[in-house]
């Protein structure tokens, strides 16, 4: 499998913005915390045959480093501090933190090491897996097909939104981790730049090179790790929210709500948090039900929902985004993050439903109990029970 051994990645910044945002917070607050994370394919794809090719790419990643022009660009952003950027300048991926194997046809990947280092593996490694698999499976697919598909979808989008006030519609590219290829993502983003409602990308490399706004705050792992960092499990979500505000008191203020279900999140999201955070991000469960709960929560706290932003990012496409926009646009500010349906939308190409999620922090289990049962991840059933009890959650959902 060495015919495709040329490196997929060419920049340390070819990752999602929230990875660097979280890494800085970990660097400042949890420098000595260790974690473990594991790969999951949520579909029925047997990806183990690609293990050797992926292992080669993991080895190649150790040569990535922050370039001088990238360092200068990050330095000009308002939320990065000099001590972190100077450390990042010396950062190199350590392939010894990653084990890749073929487990009876299934791709098995485990990451372990200091959280401040391991945190950067997830997004570029998923992008590598996606691109390597598609190179083998769909060698005939190309950028032109992706662009043709997008043009067709944009024509449908224009017809769908004719006569609709789109001044409050904001779309972001969230497509790095499951893209068909780096080239396809860049081509799609360049085309979307022509649309007035396109506001940015989660990819720091593309944001820098295309003069776009980088988008993203924090991910599930921020909340998961606090399940073991916090001395009180029931307080762990509030501890995560508070620690984020310590690092970013006036910016990057969109909170992810579904690490332990939306209902449990809202019980922790009191008036101080709700006032200080700019808004909330949806990533599982029914989006309309979620949005209604969020708006009702703000109103109950005496906060005008119009002053807050709801970000929808779960399995979206342009049509779903318009439906949500029609439903909510008069009541709250909105943004939509679309990933796979932008960057891996090519005829006869099956996108991968793949993730890498935290499973341990300081040698102890952590869990994600989202609003979609199929997204629940944890090895330790006793810990899942303890987590459900601590957060007063109802009926049991199967952990996977």
Swiss-Prot record:
EC assignment: the record states 6.3.4.21
Q: Which InterPro entries does the protein's record reference?
A: N/Namide_PRibTrfase, NAPRTase_N, Nic_PRibTrfase, Nic_PRibTrfase-Fam, Nicotinate_pribotase-like_C
Q: Which GO terms describe its cellular component?
A: cytosol
Q: Which SUPFAM superfamilies match?
A: Nicotinate/Quinolinate PRTase C-terminal domain-like (SSF51690), Nicotinate/Quinolinate PRTase N-terminal domain-like (SSF54675)
Q: What keywords are assigned to this protein?
A: Ligase, Phosphoprotein, Pyridine nucleotide biosynthesis
Family per UniProt? Belongs to the NAPRTase family.
State the HAMAP family in the record: NAPRTase
Q: What protein does this entry describe?
A: Nicotinate phosphoribosyltransferase
